Amino acid sequence: NTSVNMKNGLLYFLLCLAALVSSCDGTNTRYHIGVSQCSDDEWRHKMNKEMQREALFYDGVQVEFRTAKDNNQYQINDINYFIDRKVDLLIVAPNEAAAITPSVEKAIKKGIPVVVVDRKILSDNYTAFVGADNYKIGSDVGHYIVSRLNGKGNIFEVTGLQGSTPAMERHRGLMDALAGIPNIKRVGSVDGGWLQSQAGEKVDSVLRVHKDIDLLFAQNDRMAIGAYLAARQQGREKEMLFVGVDALPGKDYGLEQVISGVLDATFIYPTGGDKVMQIAMNILEKRPFEKENILSTALV
């Protein structure tokens, strides 16, 4: 397995190097695609690699990445940068919907097609959307909780960044799924901001107050792991179950944490970078494409 991974890694490196060399003088670039990522984490890295890899199947495609590091103003600046560069197409993963919507609409008004990925904006004024159904993920988590707790127990929720659409939709799906279950009570929530450290710090404080949590649901695996570590510091990790979302493979990520027993379950949240680039190229090359592209999810 190690040698196969090394060979795959070497092949990917050589392909990237070849693409870089062929386009470094700009003469072979047919399309310049800007990618504005809201954050910089392993889930985003996987998506970026998928986009880069898919772009190699097309001649003369230059993909430029910028990350806003969870900061609305940084992302607004990044989008303005790409607009000023007159990119041929813009891919945007919005940090917070309300803050980033005007920037996406500005790009559209300038004639730049925009593919919105993962998180939505507060408008239909974009060219295409690619992402999972976050309401369904929340609902699926809720149904899993009902089954896992046999219809009775206290749960605590760690949400993602409050202004981001996945956080809002996952919460709404969860609450709708639990609405008809009177013996399952959501005893509280904190905003973990999608970050392991922030979730861990807040859950540490929560556990000093709440002594009766049966299951802790965090809206991504990083926050679920942060919550688990906070509980372990207090010697309470065996008192409750931990459930997350993402199911990334690899050391210290969600899939491994389910196998090792740290997480009780996680739900696949597909990155879909290859699909994003395929749709981007369909738009650029005037081929048919769907405006709304929903990626499937599943329980692990």
Show the residue positions of the predicted features:
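Flexible loop/hinge segments that line or gate small-molecule binding clefts
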Residues: 97-136, 147, 154, 248-259
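Extracytoplasmic "Venus flytrap"
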Residues: 32-54, 58, 63-81, 85-87, ...
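Hinge/cleft segment of the Venus flytrap/periplasmic-binding protein
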Residues: 24, 162, 166, 177-178, ...
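Hydrophobic alpha-helical
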Residues: 80, 89-108, 174, 192-256
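Short, solvent-exposed amphipathic alpha-helices that sit
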Residues: 43-57, 61, 137-141, 165-184, ...
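Bacterial N-terminal signal peptides
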Residues: 12-20
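Short beta-strand elements at the ligand-binding edges of bilobed clamshell
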Residues: 65-67, 121-144, 157-161, 189, ...
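Hydrophobic alpha-helical segments within soluble ligand-binding/sensing domains
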Residues: 75, 130-155, 198-200, 248-254, ...
